[in-house]
Amino acid sequence: MTRQDALQTLTDLISNQNLIKHHLACEVIMLALCKRLHLEADAVTLNKWGTVGLLHDADYELTKDEPKQHTLVLEQKIGSLLDSDVMYAIKAHNFERTGFAPKSQMDWAMYCCDELSGLIIAAALIHPDKNLVSLTPEFVMKRFGEKSFAQGATREQIALCEKELKIPLQEFIQVALSAMQKIAPDLGL
């Protein structure tokens, strides 16, 4: 699936603009992580990782009241259009409910960055400048340590980047933040 097709699929399935921004953030984080983990990532590999980020929650509005169906409905709708490893990574980011445990680096990258994108956006919104460009990894790390801040962002899920991807937490945050800063206008921040 091309990026254009994936973006069209996303906008066909998701109407909430904040959810679309979340997908865009996860897409650029996944692309950055792919480059970080695969120094010589080819176009096919980059497209797969980007597609996972861009479509991982594309059925959210259809399944928000049935979390066990999240990603499985998407598979029914477009699974035949995606490479099997892309669809698996999408399902694995909801593995606590679907039973499809993350196996590959792509699976784990999506699982870890999903929560981090929200934490970074929340940090930007409380920053004095209220934008991503002024945000630093240190500022995000400080918020990461505050359990009362952005309570919906599961820290344990983000921190698995160290065990499963062998990327230190601060570097993981830096990679994600730098990626998101590049598309800050698209994210409204």
Where in the sequence are the language-model features?
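Amphipathic, non-membrane alpha-helical segments in soluble helical-bundle scaffolds
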Residues: N16, I20, M106-A109, K166, ...
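Short coil/loop linkers at secondary-structure junctions
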Residues: E40, L81-S84, P168
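Divalent metal-dependent catalytic cores for phosphoryl transfer on phosphate-bearing substrates
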Residues: T45-K147, A159
